């Protein structure tokens, strides 16, 4: 059973310079909501508090008795029992003012974090997960300047930051990087005549042609990590991949890490909240407007 009702009263519009989505925007998980009711007696103490919505434990959220290994590790994004989920017609989503979620799909937001800042908890957690794959890489080319990729960049530690470069292809890319204070950039013209420059591509765009354009910039035995999904079916240069033993791997959502001293799994959502609470990264410049819920028209 779903056990919590939450209320949303403001929508924030993303900075349009970073928006690659075609068509209408609908609320996904990037939500901060207030708890207004719950059937869980123990959880009633949290009525009035704010939460972020995240897939932490799908098995418990949908009352699936045999909890999968991923949900036990707070990796609900990779739940092995997703096909067993049964949805009810009163959960709602989109631009709903009220919707129902399980407590296992939420994480309490500290009072110190403003709601408009809290909407970045989940996107930052995606960046944290991306960085997890890059610790051993020596020189990384980032393709695609977007909200997620910028949050990823801003949350990087010094060791990875020194190895990461955003690809700048257009004047628009250049202006965005300048406006958002992104210093780790490499211009398309500079690397066009170079070969085997990078050992990793982190792609936030998902375009076959764009990835193929830069395959020659990779050293043998390099890696391509795909985060973006613009092309429904990627068509990569398999000859180049095979002849240079280049591996391709997808990255999706957020994950967790095991804390040996505390004997528990700490989700990337929790790490993201700590980053925002500390003021380590700036996010205000990624919001262009705030819209009242009552002013939204379908």
Predicted features along the sequence, with ranges:
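A short acidic, Gly/Pro-enriched loop at the edge of an enzyme's catalytic core
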Residues: 193-201
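Glycine-rich beta-strand-centered segment in the early N-terminal region that forms part
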Residues: 6-69, 110-112
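Short, well-ordered coil/turn residues at beta-beta hairpins
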Residues: 54, 202-204
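Short, well-ordered loop/turn sites that connect or cap secondary structure elements
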Residues: 45-46, 134, 218
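Hydrophobic beta-strand signal
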Residues: 51-53, 141, 225, 249
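ADP-ribose/adenylate-binding Rossmann-like module
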Residues: 217-234, 248-249
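Mid-domain Rossmann-like dinucleotide-binding core that forms the NAD(H)/NADP(H) cofactor-binding site
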Residues: 104, 111-189
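C-terminal substrate-binding/catalytic core of Rossmann-like NAD(P)-dependent dehydrogenases/reductases
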Residues: 234-288
């Amino acid at each position: 059973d779903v056990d919590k009702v939450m209320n949303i009263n403001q929508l924030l519009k993303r900075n349009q310079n970073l928006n690659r989505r075609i068509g209408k925007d609908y609320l996904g998980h990037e939500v901060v909501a207030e708890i207004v009711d719950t059937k869980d007696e123990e959880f009633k103490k949290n009525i009035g508090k704010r939460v972020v919505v995240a897939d932490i434990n799908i098995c418990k959220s949908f009352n699936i008795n045999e909890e999968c290994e991923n949900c036990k590790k707070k990796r609900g994004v990779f739940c092995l029992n997703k096909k067993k989920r049964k949805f009810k017609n009163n959960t709602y989503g989109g631009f709903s003012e009220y919707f129902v979620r399980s407590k296992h799909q939420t994480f309490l937001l500290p009072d110190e974090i403003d709601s408009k800042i809290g909407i970045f908890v989940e996107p930052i957690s995606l960046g944290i997960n991306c960085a997890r794959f890059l610790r051993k890489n020596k020189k990384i080319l980032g393709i695609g300047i977007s909200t997620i990729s910028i949050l990823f960049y801003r949350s990087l530690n010094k060791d990875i930051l020194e190895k990461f470069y955003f690809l700048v292809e257009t004047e628009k890319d250049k202006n965005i990087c300048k406006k958002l204070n992104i210093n780790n950039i490499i211009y398309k013209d500079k690397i066009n005549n170079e070969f085997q420059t990078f050992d990793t591509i982190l792609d936030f765009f998902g375009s076959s042609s764009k990835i193929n354009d830069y395959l020659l910039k990779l050293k043998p035995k390099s890696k391509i990590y795909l985060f973006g999904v613009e092309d429904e079916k990627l068509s990569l240069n398999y000859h180049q991949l095979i002849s240079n033993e280049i591996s391709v791997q997808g990255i999706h959502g957020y994950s967790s890490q095991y804390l040996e001293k505390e004997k528990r799994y700490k989700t990337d959502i929790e790490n993201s909240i700590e980053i925002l609470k500390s003021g380590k990264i700036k996010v205000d410049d990624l919001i262009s407007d705030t819209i009242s819920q009552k002013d939204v028209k379908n």
